[in-house]
UniProtKB/Swiss-Prot annotation:
GO BP terms in the entry: carbohydrate metabolic process; pentose-phosphate shunt, oxidative branch; tRNA export from nucleus
Native species: Saccharomyces cerevisiae (strain ATCC 204508 / S288c) (Baker's yeast)
GO cellular component: cytoplasm; cytosol
Gene symbol of the encoding locus: SOL2
UniProt name for this protein: 6-phosphogluconolactonase-like protein 2
Protein family membership: Belongs to the glucosamine/galactosamine-6-phosphate isomerase family. 6-phosphogluconolactonase subfamily.
Subcellular location: Cytoplasm
Modification Phosphoserine, positions: 42, 64
Amino acid sequence: MTTTVPKIFAFHEFSDVAEAVADHVVHAQDGALAPKNERKHSVPNISMNALDMTREASCKSTASAAEGKSGSSGSGSGSSKPKKEKRFKIALSGGSLIEVLHEGLLKRDDVRWGDWDIYFADERLVPFSSNESNYGCAKRKILDLIDTAKYGTPKVYHIDESLIDDPQECADNYEKVLIRGFAGRDSVKLPMFDLFLLGCAPDGHIASLFPNFQDNLREKLAWVVPVENAPSGPSTRISLTIPVICHSHRVTFVVEGATKAPIIKTIMERPEKGLPSSIVNEGAAGRVSWFVDDDALTDVLVTKKKYKFHQGLSI
């Protein structure tokens, strides 16, 4: 593995992280929803022709295709529209990231919630009412608090709660949700999210991809894998895979707290260790950003960048 260095933005306080992440999310949203001729320079190192082709394919099957038991909620009526619809496709993990988004996004008036398709990077197989549920936490901390009359209602794609006792069936079902949302596997080899948001746990796992679960880390074909006997938290989960993460238009890690400093040091200084986030840094090189507070960067030898808030589509 080469020593690919991502962009690392450092911040003093949690509130600073939240504000910058929210700006970054809105910038990604604006780039995804803008007319093609306004997106020329939105992201470096990507062929915009290829990106446009992928986006157009992804829009062939709109978010309403996954309504109902297969795991979608939102404002869609369920009726198909022949006209292609621009959507901002975002994947979220759970944990402290939800708090960051709660703090940063809800106070902004430029979030076009009604144009969002929200998927989950992973899910703990617990009831949605549990504080361990990524969807449940996102619903209570973010989705239920959106002024939908003003900003619209996002379409939200979660697991089928009735399948939480069967990790393989739950993973297969959620993969079908992704397939419907991204035009079908016969025409799209991998889904392309406009933005993939991740945290990183002290043990190095991202989404629900754990460092010592090599079969999951080496998975090349499946979009979603079951996770059993997870070493921390709920033992059964599902997770989107490394190829799906790395195929995203942007991949962003959000990390806070001194407890994360040792693992961040390993990720940044010892990429050859092959931790999941190091694999993503390499696999999505040029499209990865880290938003990290000073505590999590304690004794970490990296070049820190100052985040510049965006106006328009320039980076």
